[in-house]
């Protein structure tokens, strides 16, 4: 129940952010940066709700797995998944690809995220210790983030920016 409530709140916030920009969900491209833990599960359930409302949602899996129930809900809602880790074990998704293909997938993920209207960051939660490492760090750095754990939770200021992509952190 707690995860579903967090996901509903995140989906509501995301829809509100897009509405503030005069964008209908069915006209938007949303990227979810999804980690393997419960924070990633929150993001997957939120992304599933947005996909059910007509948004074009792509989840970028930054780890070797995804929250099982969140992943199932997201796929049922029509969400697409891009796996970055060659050692990933995510049902129905490619794995075991070469280092060269992993680099190409990372570049694709960066391009897709940069072209989106909204990025939902659910890579890690409040339990992270230290800075991001590996694929999450590379992705965060490429998207203009510093890769360090935030001093406080990131919450949108609800002011219209006109700049895309907007970012919503699921903490």
What do the predicted segments below correspond to?
Residues 23-170:
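Glycine-rich phosphate/dinucleotide-binding loop and adjoining beta-alpha-beta core of small-molecule
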Residues 1-33:
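An N-terminal, well-structured beta->alpha segment
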């Amino acid at each position: 129940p707690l995860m579903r409530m967090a996901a509903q709140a995140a989906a509501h916030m995301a829809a509100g952010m897009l509405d503030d920009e005069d964008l209908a969900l069915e006209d938007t491209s949303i990227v979810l940066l999804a980690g393997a833990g419960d924070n990633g599960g929150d993001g997957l359930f939120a992304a599933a709700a947005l996909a059910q409302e007509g948004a074009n949602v792509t989840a970028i899996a930054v780890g070797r797995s995804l929250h099982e129930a969140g992943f199932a809900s997201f796929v049922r809602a029509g969400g697409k998944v891009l796996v970055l880790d060659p050692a990933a074990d995510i049902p129905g998704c490619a794995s075991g690809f070469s280092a060269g293909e992993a680099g190409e997938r990372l570049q694709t993920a960066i391009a897709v995220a940069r072209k989106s209207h909204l990025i939902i960051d659910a890579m890690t939660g409040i339990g992270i210790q230290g800075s991001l490492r590996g694929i999450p760090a590379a992705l965060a750095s490429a998207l203009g983030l510093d890769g360090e754990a935030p001093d406080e939770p990131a919450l949108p200021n609800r002011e219209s920016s006109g700049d895309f992509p907007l970012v919503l952190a699921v903490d």
